Curated annotation (Swiss-Prot):
This is Glutamate-1-semialdehyde 2,1-aminomutase. It comes from Caldicellulosiruptor saccharolyticus (strain ATCC 43494 / DSM 8903 / Tp8T 6331). Its EC number is 5.4.3.8. InterPro entries: 4pyrrol_synth_GluAld_NH2Trfase (IPR004639), Aminotrans_3 (IPR005814), Aminotrans_3_PPA_site (IPR049704), PyrdxlP-dep_Trfase (IPR015424), PyrdxlP-dep_Trfase_major (IPR015421), PyrdxlP-dep_Trfase_small (IPR015422). The keyword Cytoplasm applies. The keyword Transport does not apply.
């Protein structure tokens, strides 16, 4: 593949946008290839300005569960865009969207915001306001957005950066413990008795690569939070509406007090939300005295796209069955390819999201993820992308499937992966 036009545009963009991107992971900093500048997406395929075609397994970092430019989502936007863009005032589609989200995700109430970061920020403020406590517990490798309170030992692109500009006075109230380690969470509560407002966790981590929480671990978190009067927050920005209509909660049968949403909930447009128990949600202004606001929150275009997406998922539950079958096939094909090539690897998969780790046989937390062969993953990402399979450039991100993918797309992924295995095995 040639990336001449992409390189030219990307280099020119750096004159006006720091690093040439509006989110660090897009810059391919850890790869030796230029990030393709994308011009079009349709179904499970994207195209760059050099004319290269890719089967997309990034899908706007999981947001495009129906594939790019799904006709129903596109039509929903067209239906409102000539009359409704933004008012900063109530609209009927907000009501319809809120009702649909509450019914499908099974939360009492919901507040829409503009991003996953805003959703988690709001959830934490709500937890502090409701409990009257200042400290929070998060887990190493879990990424909850770019606010100061969350960037302590975070995953995603943060894992590869040395950060400055973080307010230490804020961060000192963030306690970081090890994912899937019950002793570490018990120690945190013992050392910070009656000070912890909330525990926030990705029930399936997607930003240290895919790493699922153990069911008994989440059940223990629920019990510990109840014992100490702390809230349990599930960050389902990635997993919400991806693993099921009820997200990861349906898999674990553990109910948090609050849950955050993003990505899929906006149908590919900027949207986040926090939902949860009525008695807690009612603390938000103007009903309560925990403040949150946003000029563009719940705007008609985003609400329409999100409504069309969730409505389609609700009316077609077989989509989740189809995604599971495709993901099983992809996992199985990759395991066969890497095993036959005598590569040491681990594939972590939950539903339609997965990560390949090289050089290790098990990954259950961030420390284990960091011990994987990062240089091998770099080679893997470069090889796959330059051969038309668009995957994350970072080890600490997830691959995703959409309902637009087919079995032939999965087979093509395995074929290219087999080429990679032969490539790295060359003497």
């Amino acid at each position: 593949m040639r990336f001449d036009k992409s390189k030219e545009i990307f280099d020119n963009t750096k004159r006006y946008i720091p690093g040439g991107v509006n989110s660090p992971v897009r810059a391919f900093k850890n790869l030796s290839i230029t990030p393709p500048v994308i011009s079009k997406g349709k179904g499970c395929r994207i195209f760059d300005i050099d004319g290269n075609e890719y089967i997309d397994f990034v899908l706007s970092w999981g947001a495009m569960i129906l594939g790019h430019c799904d006709p129903d989502v596109v039509n929903s936007i067209k239906e409102v865009v000539e009359d409704q863009i933004a008012f900063g005032a109530p609209t009927e589609i907000e009501y319809k969207m809120a009702k649909l989200v509450c019914e499908t995700a099974q939360v009492d109430m919901v507040r829409f915001v503009n991003s996953g970061t805003e959703a988690t920020m709001t959830a934490i403020r709500l937890a502090k306001g409701y409990t009257g406590k200042k400290k929070i517990v998060k887990f190493a490798g879990c990424y909850h957005g770019h606010h100061d309170i969350f960037l302590k030992e975070a995953g995603s692109a943060v894992a590869e950066l040395r950060l400055k500009g973080i307010d230490e006075d804020i961060v000192q109230n963030t306690i970081v413990v090890e994912y899937n380690n019950l002793d570490s969470i018990e120690k945190a509560f013992k050392e910070n008795k009656d000070e912890i407002s909330a525990v926030i966790i990705e029930p399936v981590a997607g930003n240290m690569g895919v790493v699922p929480a153990k069911k008994e671990f989440l059940q223990a978190l629920r019990e510990i939070c109840d014992l100490h009067g702390s809230l349990l927050i599930f960050d389902e920005v990635i997993t919400g509406f991806r693993l099921s209509l009820k997200g990861a909660r349906a898999l674990y049968n553990v109910e948090p007090d609050l849950v955050t949403f993003g990505k899929i909930i906006g149908g590919g447009l900027p949207c986040g939300a926090v939902g949860g128990k009525k008695e807690i949600m009612q603390c938000l202004a103007p009903q309560g005295n925990v403040f949150q606001a946003g000029t563009m929150s719940g705007n008609p275009i985003v609400m329409s796209a999100g409504y069309a997406t969730i409505k389609k998922l609700k009316e077609n539950p077989d989509i989740y069955t189809y995604l599971e079958l495709l993901a099983q096939k992809l996992e199985g094909n990759l395991a066969k390819v890497f095993s036959s090539s005598n590569l040491t690897f681990c594939i972590n998969r939950v539903g339609s999201m997965l990560t390949v780790f090289f050089g290790v046989e098990k990954v259950e937390n961030f420390e284990m993820a960091k011990k994987s062969n990062l240089s091998m993953f770099k080679k893997f990402a470069e090889y796959m992308i330059t051969n038309g399979i668009y995957i994350p450039s970072s080890q600490f991100e997830a691959m995703f499937l959409s309902s637009a993918h087919t079995e032939s797309d999965i087979e093509r992924f395995a074929e290219v992966a087999e080429g990679f295995a032969k490539f790295v095995k060359k003497p």
